[in-house]
């Protein structure tokens, strides 16, 4: 990364960082896409089981990744402030936190999740598939969190192409393992939907291996000496990571868990509805890669410029990100509307299930416009390290407004589609409130900078 002067130069740097991130996110989300489609091609029961299992893993995955992503703005600001020597210890303390969290989650999976599954309104077969899907995921949880730290370190330096290379190398391996474990090919056991969990868990370890190799061989990464001895656990650094990471993780948890809660509530409408909801939701997850990548880009660039005390530049990057996200939202909405029948055909050959998926995709258009505003705002706030209030706003918007609206509408003739209207309502409320917040934060940072100049 480097300082830019003109809007054209800023757009170029924005796209240079954004493009590899979006390719990475699309490739990562394609893992979920192939888990869903390949399980659906095995059976509707397998698809429903993966949907329930994913409803547990997805919010945990996103929330804890969000917590660990706290090192991205921390390192970006250190680089902007020319404090590169502090980067190694930041990464190491992030790794210590990651391993501790992995241990806790594995315990929860084996001690708590089975009890929850037995009390859910799903068939015994679906619960069994979900249980073994999660056991497979557990194999790779430590690797997943380690790779999250290493990916955040790489991205915070603006070297998003490296992350892209890592992902492009590993996802085809995941698809191959899905083919082996789900359908029992090449002498592997036929595990159905549960096999996609084992395929994903094993793939996470490959991601770590490739990440370590690239960090050790790329000059711009090797110079930080990440793997040259361990640095001490610093509680001040842990406190900083937790202070940014917990609100960030909770914000993501409240958003992703609301979708998981809706998946569970869909059980009242039957297996077919769960399968249709999961299929449409996997499409939304894939498209969400674009606004999410805008947010990640703004976190990196905003953190870098804030660390360098160039607040005007950070604000200009936010405007660029907002423009890009809105354009992307319009394109995604058009794709969902005009190609919904083709998209549904990827998931099933069943005419009734296909019709349900298409109906969900129409309501998913609302998500595209809400995320077009919300995601870049969240990315900018993370770059500014102003995340304390975001989790509170997310909880109110999603759980106290969005879910009750959706629950109420589900008793009307909208049925299960009412939940998706409720979800959209929550996203729009959060987008509106946080848009006000980011402007207030920028004014506060500018005022603090001016006061610092006067006092000096």
Swiss-Prot record:
Q: By its UniProt entry, which NCBIfam families does this protein fall under?
A: matE
Give a GO molecular function annotation for the protein.
Answer: xenobiotic transmembrane transporter activity
Q: What is this protein called?
A: Probable multidrug resistance protein NorM
Asked if the Swiss-Prot or TrEMBL record annotates the protein with the keyword Cell cycle, the reply is: no
Where in or outside the cell is it found? Cell membrane
Its main localization is membrane
Q: Does the keyword Acyltransferase apply?
A: no
Hey, which family's this protein in? Belongs to the multi antimicrobial extrusion (MATE) (TC 2.A.66.1) family.
Q: What InterPro entries does the record point to?
A: MATE_fam, MATE_MdtK, MdtK-like
Task: Kindly state which keywords UniProt assigns to this record, in alphabetical order.
Answer: Antiport, Cell membrane, Ion transport, Membrane, Transmembrane, Transmembrane helix, Transport
Can you supply a Gene Ontology BP term from the record? monoatomic ion transport
Q: What is the lineage of its organism?
A: Bacteria, Bacillati, Bacillota, Bacilli, Bacillales
């Amino acid at each position: 990364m480097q300082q830019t002067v003109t809007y054209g130069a800023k757009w170029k740097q924005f796209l240079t960082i954004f493009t590899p991130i979006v390719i990475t996110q699309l490739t990562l989300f394609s893992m979920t896409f192939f888990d869903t489609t390949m399980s659906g091609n095995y059976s509707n029961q397998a698809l429903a089981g993966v949907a329930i299992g994913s409803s547990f893993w997805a919010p945990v995955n996103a929330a804890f990744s969000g917590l660990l992503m706290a090192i991205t703005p921390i390192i970006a600001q250190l680089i902007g402030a020319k404090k590169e020597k502090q980067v190694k210890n930041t990464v190491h303390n992030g790794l210590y936190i990651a391993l501790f969290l992995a241990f806790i989650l594995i315990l929860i999976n084996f001690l708590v999740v089975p009890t929850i599954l037995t009390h859910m309104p799903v068939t015994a077969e679906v619960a069994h598939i979900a249980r073994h899907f999660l056991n497979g995921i557990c194999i790779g949880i430590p690797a997943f969190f380690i790779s999250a730290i290493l990916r955040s370190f790489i991205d915070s330096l603006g070297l998003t192409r490296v992350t892209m290379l890592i992902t492009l190398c590993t996802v085809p391996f995941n698809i191959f393992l899905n083919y082996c474990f789900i359908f029992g090919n090449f002498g592997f056991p036929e595990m159905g939907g549960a096999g996609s969990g084992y395929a994903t868990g094993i793939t996470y370890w490959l991601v770590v291996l490739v990440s370590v190799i690239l960090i050790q061989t790329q000059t711009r990464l090797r110079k930080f000496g990440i793997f040259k001895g361990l640095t001490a656990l610093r509680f001040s650094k842990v406190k900083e990571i937790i202070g940014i990471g917990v609100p960030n993780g909770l914000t993501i948890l409240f958003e992703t868990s609301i979708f998981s809660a809706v998946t569970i509530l869909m059980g009242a409408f039957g297996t077919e509805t769960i399968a249709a909801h999961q299929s449409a939701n996997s499409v939304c997850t894939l498209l969400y890669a674009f606004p999410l990548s805008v947010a990640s880009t703004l976190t990196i660039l905003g953190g870098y410029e804030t660390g360098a005390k160039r607040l005007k530049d950070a604000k200009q990057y936010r405007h660029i990100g907002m423009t890009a996200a809105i354009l992307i939202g319009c394109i995604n909405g058009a794709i969902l509307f005009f190609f919904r029948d083709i998209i549904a055909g990827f998931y099933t050959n069943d005419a009734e299930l296909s019709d349900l998926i298409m109906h969900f995709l129409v309501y998913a258009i609302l998500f595209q416009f809400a995320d077009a505003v919300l995601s870049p705002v969240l990315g900018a706030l993370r770059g500014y390290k102003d995340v304390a209030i975001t989790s509170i706003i997310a909880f109110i918007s999603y759980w106290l407004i969005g879910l009750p609206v959706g629950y109420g509408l589900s008793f009307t003739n909208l049925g299960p589609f009412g939940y998706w209207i409720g979800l959209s309502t929550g996203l729009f409320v959060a987008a509106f409130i946080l848009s006000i917040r980011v402007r207030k934060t920028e004014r506060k940072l500018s005022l603090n900078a001016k006061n610092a100049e006067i006092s000096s």
